[in-house]
Amino acid sequence: MIRHIDARREDLEPDRQDRELVTRDRLASDLAALGVRPGGVLLVHASLSALGWVCGGAQAVVLALQDAVGKEGTLVMPTFSGDLSDPSTWRRPPVPEDWWPVIREQMPPFDPDLTPTRGMGAVAECFRRAAGAVRSGHPQNSFAAWGAHAEQVVAEHGLTERLGRGSPLEQVYRLDGQVLLLGCGFESNTSFHLAEYRTAYPGRRSHRRRVPVPEGDRVRWVEQEDIVYFEEDFQTMGESCLTRTPGHSRGTVGEAAAVLYGQRAFVDLACEWMTAHRDLARAVGA
């Protein structure tokens, strides 16, 4: 027997009465007030929960972002799938060691249309499926893009320097795009990884990584050398870059704190900051 829930029941408490109702139109208006302009290239990191009670959820956020940049603009979001990695490196949660060979053999290959994001949030997962969106081909660190420069943004994303040379991050840099942190801190700012590739800061290290490269309906495991990422100082670095960057803006979009800034200036300043202040030979947690 199927039981139906009566949505008219009067004993149900209204959802989140202490929060404002946030709509697509309001989000688009708030984005414009923050400084998002039609025709621009915008790399977005967004937290849906930080925005408040959004009518339409992640879909409304994606539509509002599209409204803000317009048809001549370009939106970009990271759509990482970190679970397409060697199971021996999994920590949250780990899996039994006797599972590793089976997982390596049976792992589905990356499919830009089918493979879901992992840990990227509802907005990024919704955005990658938007009409007209395209996704780069890196099995672990793909980006989705929509709009006038979408194809250019994702075209050169190879296996080496996954967030460096040829990556969508570098394409946003070339296009002099902006970054929008929407309810996120600088620890979510993937553009700082581009700076890590460009800077020979003290203590920079590399390691060997295994990447599952699609081969038909299976994967072939390829071992590559890559730099070790370090995000523990991203918030400090970001705040420092803000003090030296004219033209950035802080505000509120929905109920979320938001920061908008030029990516190119931030990456260049981050390179300088790492050279002067970062030493992974001494850093705790490196």
UniProtKB/Swiss-Prot annotation:
Changing H45A: Retains 1.5% of activity with CMP-5'-3APn as substrate. Acetyl-CoA binds at H45, A46, S47, L48, S49, V54, A122, S188, T190. GO terms for molecular function: aminoglycoside 3-N-acetyltransferase activity. Keywords: Acyltransferase, Antibiotic biosynthesis, Transferase. GO terms for biological process: antibiotic biosynthetic process; response to antibiotic. InterPro entries: Amioglycoside_AcTrfase, Antibiotic_NAT-like. Changing E231A: No change in activity with CMP-5'-3APn as substrate. Pathway: Antibiotic biosynthesis. Its EC number is 2.3.1.-. Coiled coil: none annotated. Changing T190S: No change in activity with CMP-5'-3APn as substrate. Pfam families: Antibiotic_NAT. SUPFAM superfamilies: TTHA0583/YokD-like. It catalyses: CMP-5'-(N-hydroxy-3-aminopropyl)phosphonate + acetyl-CoA = CMP-5'-(N-acetyl-N-hydroxy-3-aminopropyl)phosphonate + CoA. Acetyltransferase involved in the biosynthesis of the phosphonate antibiotic FR-900098, a potent antimalarial agent that acts as an inhibitor of 1-deoxy-D-xylulose 5-phosphate reductoisomerase (DXR), the first enzyme in the nonmevalonate pathway for isoprenoid biosynthesis. Catalyzes the N-acetylation of CMP-5'-(N-hydroxy-3-aminopropyl)phosphonate (CMP-5'-H3APn), leading to the formation of CMP-5'-(N-acetyl-N-hydroxy-3-aminopropyl)phosphonate (CMP-5'-FR-900098). The acetyltransferase fold is distinct from that of members of the canonical GNAT superfamily. Homodimer. The four molecules in the crystallographic asymmetric unit pack as two pairs of dimers. Belongs to the antibiotic N-acetyltransferase family. This is CMP-5'-(N-hydroxy-3-aminopropyl)phosphonate acetyltransferase. It comes from Streptomyces rubellomurinus (strain ATCC 31215).
